Amino acid sequence: LVGPNSIGLVSTATGLDATFLEGRPPEGSLSLMSQSGAFIAAVIGWAAQHDIGFNDVVSLGNEAVLDEVDFLRQWDDDPATDVILAYVEDIDDGQAFIETAQDVTATTPVVVIKSGRTEAGAAAAKSHTGSMAGHDDAYRAAFEQAGVLRADTIQDVFDVGQLLAGQPGLDGDRVAVLTNGGGPGVLTTDAVGDSRLDIATFSDETRADLDELLPAAADITNPLDIIGDADLARFDAALDAVLADEAVDGAVVLSVPTALYEVDALADRIGDRQTEHGTPVVACLMGGEPADRAADTLAEYGIPNHFDPARAVASLEALADYGDIRDREYETPTEFAVDRERAFEILAQADDREVDYLGVEAMELLAAYGIP
């Protein structure tokens, strides 16, 4: 039983549409659950416009029976779900969520956008669902412990979700930047520098190959600027050499539109080279309507296209974060005997006194949680 206070659910694979939404989302490998029906209604049309497909979409409502933990388990066992996305305002059973998410994220990425991060947002969440949103630092720590990737914006949720669904894992932090325009290449390099990622150092063999392939005016270091007169053949040859380098774990490919190549054809070359080498790639094919068409071509290869290089780097960084999550081993947490009744009594007394701090009662509260 889903709900109450839910707009229903959709399963695109089976054709089930038990909602009153205006349109049905396209079929895909993302599964989305949300504690806000309005969030689903807001993003479904936008996602369809951007060719973002879903396997299941579930409005959780007030979670009288089924909650986010149940759907984590459901989608972990579902081969049609590659990535789980979630909008949450609060989580009632934090321990169950953490333990379940640790199991799930070993094979299936989970990306969560958590509202109520600020005092004003928490108050709005309470008025919306009646939920008591906990302190955001506690949620941040819980998500980290659970192996959950946290997104701060709607755009981030789908940027990361699409990349995780379409690209192989990032085995390291070394990134190549390939561009035909100096300015965007520098912006991308700055974004890499602001992230956990590193600018890769090309091997001597790759540098020798690039020296033969590129004009004398081109600098064969990383970021690799193949200069503004690059045609399709130069783009393709340079990308082939870069992705073949074992010192490169991932790549950002940028193109500034010129009359020397068709951007649709470039998108096909990028997709073919990524498939050939198996190295994760994100693209920034800039421009207007032709770039939109190229983005559709890239999507067929599971490669996202971003106008802003910072978004491309951020999604690639999330791919590296998930690689760490997938490979890590969890320690069994220490369990304490908790006297919850006494703990609530201490906090209630402090609330009655209208104070936001504890004096000597803090020791009693720690003792109630078994903390010496």
Locate the predicted segments by residue.
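Catalytic-core regions of core metabolic enzymes
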Residues: V2-P372
